[in-house]
Amino acid sequence: MTTLTLLQLNDLHGYLEPHPELVRTEGGWRFERLGGVARIARLFEEARAEGACLTLDNGDTFHGTRVAVASRGEALVPIMNALKIDAMTAHWEFAYGPAGFKALAAGLDYPVL
């Protein structure tokens, strides 16, 4: 039997570096440093080295941080292309309007479904 691993990314919100997030644990709520595109890339590479993967971005990627909003998402396009995503859905990406959304999608190396 062939195994296919699904890799999912969502709600990046333009955060390229690890950042504090409030996380609920058994002991209550606490802040932890999460995320970071370099860390995500490493995890994706490790999974791909083990076998076939389908990598999906579920959106909320190109909007949120200063760099994302100031560039209307464009600054993140080459970074996201480097992650070798297979396909994406969108959510806040529509905040840049139809033309902005189309421009982002045109720059990606993968389809926006």
Where are these regions (language model features)?
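Acidic, metal/ion-coordinating pockets
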Residues: 1-113
